[in-house]
């Protein structure tokens, strides 16, 4: 048990408490299995216990902060319109950036307001990318999009079609899918201009969860909408609400 505790303390100096807890849990299960197989008599990992979890503060924007940012984008400019719809879609759906980059017009039913999420995009370069199936079945989901989002998407589709008549990607301004650096850089620049705190692109997903929680939505339904995500993470985005 002493050796395991020494290992645990050493690990805690290098990694986050939550990561150490995961590794410790796996070690504990391994010892349990060893006991069943007759390879060990005791479980030292269970004897010393796990370290305390650390609540991670998750960053997000409120609706008001998001509106300040997108208000800086002029939809009369083709590229700015592309940025507008990209950030709008991420904030209003909670999609991961890879899921949004892989989204195609055929995945959206404007009549029913349903959006199908069935793939993600692995992007290496402009000419080297591929669709990847989600790691879990829960990532395959169909979500409802609100009337304003439908309107914004239809407007962007019409504008995009004039420049790129045969483009299948929703978030594209040049016939290729959105790169993994374009949106994060633009988001950081716009945040500075808008005078709001900077967030990572993934935080728009957390912002969507925060918005739904503030509207009184059921946390379990929010989790289903976001796909595989710990419910504690979903709730943690808006612990102040």
Question: Each predicted region: which residue ranges?
Answer:
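N-terminal core-binding DNA-recognition domain of tyrosine site-specific recombinases/integrases
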Residues: 1-39, 55, 76-81, 177-182, ...
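Short, basic (Lys/Arg/His-rich) helix/loop patches that form interaction surfaces
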Residues: 14-17, 71-83, 93, 143, ...
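Basic, Lys/Arg- and aromatic-enriched nucleic-acid-binding interface segment
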Residues: 17, 21, 36-103, 111, ...
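Catalytic-site neighborhood detector that most strongly recognizes the C-terminal catalytic loop/helix
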Residues: 60, 121, 226-241
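Basic, Lys/Arg-rich DNA-contacting stretches centered on the C-terminal catalytic core
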Residues: 98, 111-149, 159-163
């Amino acid at each position: 048990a002493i050796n395991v505790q020494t290992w645990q303390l050493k690990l805690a100096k290098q990694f986050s408490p939550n990561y150490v807890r995961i590794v410790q849990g796996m070690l504990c299960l391994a010892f349990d299995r060893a006991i069943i197989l007759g390879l060990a008599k005791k479980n030292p990992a269970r004897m010393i216990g796990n370290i305390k979890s650390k609540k991670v503060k998750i960053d997000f924007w409120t609706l008001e902060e998001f509106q300040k940012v997108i208000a800086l984008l002029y939809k009369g400019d083709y590229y700015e319109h592309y940025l507008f719809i990209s950030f709008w879609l991420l904030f209003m759906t909670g999609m991961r950036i890879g899921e949004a980059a892989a989204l195609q017009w055929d995945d959206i039913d404007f009549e029913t307001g349903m959006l199908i999420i069935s793939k993600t995009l692995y992007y290496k370069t402009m000419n080297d990318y591929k669709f990847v199936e989600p790691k879990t079945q829960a990532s395959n989901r169909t979500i409802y999009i609100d009337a304003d989002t439908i309107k914004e998407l239809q407007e962007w589709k019409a504008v995009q079609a004039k420049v790129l008549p045969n483009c299948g990607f929703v978030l594209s301004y040049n016939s290729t899918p959105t790169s993994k650096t374009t949106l994060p850089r633009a988001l950081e620049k716009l945040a500075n201009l808008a005078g709001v705190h900077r967030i990572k692109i993934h935080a728009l997903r957390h912002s969507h969860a925060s918005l739904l929680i503030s509207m009184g939505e059921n946390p379990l339904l929010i989790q289903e909408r976001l796909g595989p995500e710990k419910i504690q993470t979903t709730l943690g985005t808006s612990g102040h609400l």
